[in-house]
Amino acid sequence: MSRINKFVLTVSLLIFIMISAVACGIYTQMVKERVYSLKQSVIDTAFAVANIAEYRRSVAIDLINTLNPTEEQLLVGLRTAYADSVSPSYLYDVGPYLISSDECIQVKEFEKNYCADIMQVVKYRHVKNTGFISFDGKTFVYYLYPVTHNRSLIFLLGLERFSLLSKSLAMDSENLMFSLFKNGKPVTGDEYNAKNAIFTVSEAMEHFAYLPTGLYVFAYKKDVYLRVCTLIIFFAALVAVISGASCLYLVRRVINRGIVEKEAIINNHFERVLDGGLFFSAADVKKLYSMYNSAFLDDLTKAMGRKSFDEDLKALPEKGGYLCLFDVDKFKNINDTFGHLLGDEVLMKVVKILKSQIPVDKGKVYRFGGDEFAVIYTGGTLEELLSILKEIVHFQVGSINLSTSIGVAHSNECPTVERLKMLADERLYKSKKNGRAQISWQ
């Protein structure tokens, strides 16, 4: 695995861990807050029930203090008052009942009468208290409020309704669990199982006088919590994979672009990045181009210099290709007859012709000095090379006809580069000996 791949993998892993940890942490905190909100909803529900029970007691006391009614008159007055101000239907299942030491009267009409059961179960009839009462296969929370020294009102609320009302006030109620235990036995709420619950909170609630005594248990459904966390982790993994792939793509593009720029500069193809690249501005490229020319190129012809030739020749046996040595025929006579300015034009023209014919990825032109040149060709066949070299066997500068003599040798013909140079040089002189203006490759 490359260093880049390791780096991208590390970044992706960090992204995955960070998103998973942060998102799951936030979700966990939300779940815990919802569990505590359910606890508060139970307290608020009990408080609301107690307040309405207290309101109904105050109605009865006002009637007694104002009218000093008989039992029958008090009952009629309560029914009338409650009819004028009906309590919310979601709070009460049955009642209230007016009870004394030896009598129980149903205040609301047209309901099932539980007086006999109440008289049998409720022991403290003249002391304010709350608790549980069960009859007819149902369990109720009861609130008992004295209205006179020997009469009290008792209000009943079904535990199932109490539980539903409490959960309805909390967020995400369908995934919350609420159970109430009395003497170690479940009284109401969800079927609590520790294996299926998470973030369990339990409290006796003894310090709340308006709550029935018991153990209140609040929790969140474990399977829902784990399912959401799994989705979060999957999403984090997806984001990490996409981020990693994008990062790897961008890094590889940057590196590939850098490689292209490096090779363009190293191989003297500055035109590819002259307009500015990823790592080098146009000004940087021009400076590098100038430095490169000074170090590696012939100032006059812009052919590669002797240093580059020696380096490329060493690599030729491994790559496989041709070495061509040539010079301009009777170049001294040209200089003596027409002057050095024309001589320079001749040298530049030879290099220009070859550069226009040789693809940049297949060969290079070198100048050793004077009219001595070389070509290293690695990208094609002998026929292709001969076709290129024929362009300089005969050529013109202005109206002057000129020619070159060329010797060609292949790297497979010689065991060393020194012998390869000697063979190409021998064939160059063979071309001159045979009348110049020709190519010798055998």
From Swiss-Prot:
Endpoints of the signal sequence: 1-23
Catalytic activity: 2 GTP = 3',3'-c-di-GMP + 2 diphosphate
MF-aspect GO terms: diguanylate cyclase activity; GTP binding; metal ion binding
Gene Ontology, cellular component aspect: plasma membrane
Cofactor note: Binds 1 Mg(2+) ion per monomer.
Binding-site list for Mg(2+): 327, 371
Residues binding substrate, per UniProt: 335, 340, 344
EC number: 2.7.7.65
Pathway where it operates: Purine metabolism; 3',5'-cyclic di-GMP biosynthesis
A Gene Ontology biological process term: cell adhesion involved in single-species biofilm formation
Key words, A-Z: Cell membrane, GTP-binding, Lipoprotein, Magnesium, Membrane, Metal-binding, Nucleotide-binding, Palmitate, Signal, Transferase, Transmembrane, Transmembrane helix
Domain GGDEF: 319-442
A Pfam family it matches: GGDEF
Quaternary structure note: Homodimer.
Name of the protein described by the UniProt record: Probable diguanylate cyclase DgcI
Species of provenance: Escherichia coli (strain K12)
